[in-house]
Amino acid sequence: MTFELAAEHEQFRRTVRDFAEKEVAPHAAQWDRDHYFPVEVVARMGELGLFGLTAPEEYGGAGLSGEDGGFTSLCLAIEELGRIDQSIGITLEAAVGLGINPILTFGTEEQKQQWLPDLVAGRTLAGFGLTEPGAGSDAGATKTRAELSNDEWVINGSKQFITNSGSSLTSVVAVTARTGAVTDSQGNERAEISALLVPAGTPGFTAEKAYDKLGWHASDTHPLSFEDVHVPAASLLG
């Protein structure tokens, strides 16, 4: 077993390192001071194909083959960006791991066609709304609720610390919510937790003022609120 990177991975690492040192490093300190989310750098990352490393070609991704399906390249990109500015590293990590991959893994073909091409190209970003005040990231403790009424889900609740959820690039947030109850194999009833795709700009969906965090000031992180937010029944993810 060898732990050395393949030649193509080393080449890719050098490409991302060069980008980070030339286009991120000169501005990182100022972005952090200004609490500025650099949408222009996200666009450049999209041009480099960084958001599509694990996505199939049919949605605009790299379609990388092999055992890792592009995840080694993704990890190298996150590492090199984070070496210069962790805000930019987490932007990529969350955009793919929390934004693209849930839709790619669990979405219907219609959902994939609607959202993935722009997400994979870096033209837009998606968030994943799990964490809540008082519940943390414990999905089973989710308090946000969604009720199905006349072929629409009506969502009420709040989320906190949601990355890539409130910039001009945000197109959609997958929101976890209680959608009913299920009975487990032991006969015990528990909450049914589902994820719903909520487009940015949907009435009642508000990305509140970005957090003044201890660090990562150039990462886009917001509390979210949902007040009688209506989305189609087909917005259910998975």
Predicted feature residues:
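A glycine-rich, basic-preceded beta-loop-alpha segment at the flavin cofactor/substrate interface
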Residues: 68-71, 200-210, 220-238
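Short Ser/Thr-interspersed hydrophobic loop/turn segments at strand-loop and sheet-helix junctions
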Residues: 49, 78-82, 177, 198-203, ...
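N-terminal glycine-rich flavin-associated loop
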Residues: 89-110, 136-139
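Glycine-rich phosphate/pyrophosphate-binding beta-alpha loops
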Residues: 83, 135-137, 160-167, 216
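A short, Trp-centered hydrophobic/proline-enriched beta-strand micro-motif
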Residues: 122-130
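A short core secondary-structure module
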Residues: 156-206
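Amphipathic, small/basic residue-rich leader segments at the start of a protein or domain
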Residues: 1-91, 113-114, 118-121
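A structural signal for short hydrophobic beta-strand segments in well-ordered beta-sheet cores
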Residues: 144-147
